[in-house]
Swiss-Prot record:
It comes from Deinococcus radiodurans (strain ATCC 13939 / DSM 20539 / JCM 16871 / CCUG 27074 / LMG 4051 / NBRC 15346 / NCIMB 9279 / VKM B-1422 / R1). The lineage of its organism: Bacteria, Thermotogati, Deinococcota, Deinococci, Deinococcales. May function in L-lactate utilization. It comes from the Bacteria. Belongs to the LutC/YkgG family. Homodimer. Pfam families: LUD_dom (PF02589). This is Lactate utilization protein C.
Amino acid sequence: MTTIPSTAEAKLEMLTTINRAIAGSRPEALPPYPVPAPLSRAEILHQFEDRILDYGAAYTHVSAAELPGAIAKALGNARRVIVPAGIPAPWLTVGMDVLRDEPPLSHAELDRADAVLTGCAVAISETGTIILDHRADQGRRALSLIPDFHICVVREDQIVQTVREGVEAVAASVREGRPLTWLSGGSATSDIELVRVEGVHGPRRLQVIVVG
């Protein structure tokens, strides 16, 4: 009669076998982390613009004085714009139907809005990625996931060159337990037959406005 070992015995036997197999082995040294050659400030800004446009997102670079007009222009005929509590008042212009997320808007209200306007935590030129850590100028995650059009304002001094620098920039947010959202262009996905569908996991359209 065959005796079937218990689950605990089977696990112990498996782990013992693995332990014996690796007992005499030595872990290989990790290869050095590839570090790209440092870019000048102008090169970082150009690289970021190039990546953003490559994703099919829109890109504008303006001065602080030009920012409100750039936001209004990006909105076009869209006027119902959701803004988090921490958006600076000077960013908003007369004529906008501002929907403040105070108290929190319902998902249906977010879906009916024309656009959402946020700031960001940091942006990465190497990958054209924008990271939100959902502080006051970015709002809760739903704001940047449900509306179909996201206008994101990025200060020049928030743009770093590498992913490593970007991760370091939000390390404190991670320690605080804050959620992070990483954006690289508008939302898009493809099925197994490579049929591209936009807007499945977030806004279809992304407008990046760099200010500085």
